[in-house]
């Protein structure tokens, strides 16, 4: 287990809790949180935050000795020490925060995962799979690193083949050329 990243995740979430700032773990760490175990080494920590409260997340990053490094079309990259944070906003949509363009329910209010004994909010299985569909549009799956192939397999197995195919059809119909 990568205790450096686990410790940092716990520090970030504790600081967010002090501010009543909901954060969701995304990407590979969300898969691990939902499974309740670390499945692989992670290159970064994906975080989803309320878009209108971005300044509060930036303040947490700075308080922990980090900085925002780069603006992206979907959010920003930050670093704390040697650890990379990939941060994406979610926006309030009637009754819950949602990631733009992701399936409804992308940011559950409840803590649906666990990282090293700490309950955490994490992106939904559907949002995780949706990200893999975007990735497959950019990089053919035959060219994916083994870690991404395995993480995708774990996510698909957890969600179920039928639900994955329904999502894939929705993704294709939304983004058909």
Swiss-Prot record:
Tell me which Gene Ontology terms the entry assigns under biological process.
response to antibiotic
Respond yes or no to whether keyword Translocase is given for this record.
no
| Residue span of region C-terminal domain | 93-177
Q: What is its EC number?
A: 2.7.7.46
- Signal peptide range equals none
In the record's own words, the domains note is: Has an N- and C-terminal domain; kanamycin binds in the cleft between the 2 domains.
* Record's function text: Mediates bacterial resistance to kanamycin, gentamicin, dibekacin, sisomicin and tobramycin by adenylating the 2''-hydroxyl group of these antibiotics.
Q: What is this protein called?
A: 2''-aminoglycoside nucleotidyltransferase
Q: Which gene encodes it?
A: aadB
């Amino acid at each position: 287990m990568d205790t450096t990243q686990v410790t940092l995740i716990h520090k970030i979430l504790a600081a967010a809790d002090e501010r009543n700032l909901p954060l969701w773990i995304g990407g590979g760490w969300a898969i691990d949180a939902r499974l309740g175990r670390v499945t692989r080494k992670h290159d970064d920590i994906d975080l989803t935050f309320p878009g209108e409260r971005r300044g509060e997340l930036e303040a947490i990053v700075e308080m922990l000795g980090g900085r925002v490094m780069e603006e992206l079309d979907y959010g920003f990259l930050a670093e704390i020490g040697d650890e990379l944070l990939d941060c994406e906003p979610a926006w309030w949509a009637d009754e819950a925060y949602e990631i733009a363009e992701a399936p409804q329910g992308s940011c559950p209010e409840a803590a649906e995962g666990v990282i090293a004994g700490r309950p955490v909010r994490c992106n939904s299985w559907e949002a995780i799979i949706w990200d893999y569909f975007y990735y497959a549009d950019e990089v053919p799956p035959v060219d994916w690193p083994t870690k991404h192939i395995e993480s995708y397999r774990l996510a698909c197995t957890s969600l179920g083949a039928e639900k994955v195919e329904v999502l894939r059809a929705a993704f294709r119909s939304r983004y058909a050329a």
